[in-house]
Amino acid sequence: MAEAPHIPVLLGPLLRAVAPVEGTWVDGTFGAGGYARGLLEQGADRVIGIDRDPAVFRMAEAWAGEYGDRLRLVEGTFSDLDSLAGGPVDGVVLDLGVSSMQLDQPERGFSFLRDGPLDMRMGGDGPTAAELLNTAPEQVIADVLYLYGEERASRRIAKAIVAARPLSRTGQLSDIVSACLPRPKPGQSHPSTRAFQAIRIWVNDEFGQLVAGLAAAERALRPGGKLAVVSFHSLEDRIVKRFMQARSNSAGGGSRYAPEAAREEPAFTLPFRRAIGPDEAELATNPRARSALLRVGIRTEAPAGRVDPAALGLPLLSERRA
């Protein structure tokens, strides 16, 4: 039997939260296939694995055949999951952000710890990080760093990036960012963490994809179907939280985030009052899980509605990609 893929964060809590697992599920961020395999082992009749990165399907060839036609792999973005699934589904799983697999490949340009080409694209299309940073106005770069990375030194870093252009390597970008920030104290994250996160989100339109993907999941799920979303930082989780509050009418009367949704029949119920995080055992074996949060919604019989990105707190640039 082929070696199993790595176990993704919060797999156990996710499978328990959506039990019983049955019918057809969509793994909208297939990656190394850990969630898809977990769903299949727990009783899903079929899993449709979607990913925008064609490399993940080549890696899955070593083990995917074990499941025969129970596993179907589709290249695409989870923002189109309702059309890619080809019909109603019983569950949707989304694991947001960059995968450890992508971080471990310097040639993909995601890591500030290993020098590589300044790419950061999850798929093979669209402009690279280098192309965007080398052509965008300084103000747009500053907005990206501040809105997508919550980087307080955004203006200083943007000015340094423009002064150093053209950029072509991740190491070059990391050195520029680090030179603009104080040396980190023991236990603090790398100085480039927030900037690399922000630029990656920009390159891949991750927040736009997230809002569209949540809406697509609402359209795709049968009544009683389950939506499970794992996020890794506060900006992602805020969007997911507000979506679920808005679509379940649980934000409270008069919420400024969902004034229209509160007048609609709820599209989801929320089985858990709070997000689910990792336990001590998982943290001991997988430090990457420390910031992970799982939110779950259960689809009602209400028709799918319109999702207003502004109502979800989606950070909006004044100028898209320059």
UniProtKB/Swiss-Prot annotation:
Molecular function GO labels: rRNA (cytosine-N4-)-methyltransferase activity
Binding site for S-adenosyl-L-methionine: G33, G34, Y35, D51, F78, D95, Q102
Alphabetical list of InterPro entries matching this protein: RsmH, SAM-dep_MeTrfase_MraW_recog, SAM-dependent_MTases_sf
Coiled-coil segments on the chain, per record: none
Any one GO cellular component localisation term in the record: cytoplasm
Cell compartments where the protein resides: Cytoplasm
Top-level enzyme category: transferase
S-S bridge residues: none
Taxonomic superkingdom: Bacteria
Biological process, per Gene Ontology: rRNA base methylation
Keywords: Cytoplasm, Methyltransferase, rRNA processing, S-adenosyl-L-methionine, Transferase
Keyword Ribonucleoprotein: no
Reactions mediated catalytically: cytidine(1402) in 16S rRNA + S-adenosyl-L-methionine = N(4)-methylcytidine(1402) in 16S rRNA + S-adenosyl-L-homocysteine + H(+)
Main location: cytoplasm
EC identifiers of the protein: 2.1.1.199
S-adenosyl-L-methionine in keyword set: yes
HAMAP family: 16SrRNA_methyltr_H
Membership in a protein family: Belongs to the methyltransferase superfamily. RsmH family.
Function description: Specifically methylates the N4 position of cytidine in position 1402 (C1402) of 16S rRNA.
Name the record gives this protein: Ribosomal RNA small subunit methyltransferase H
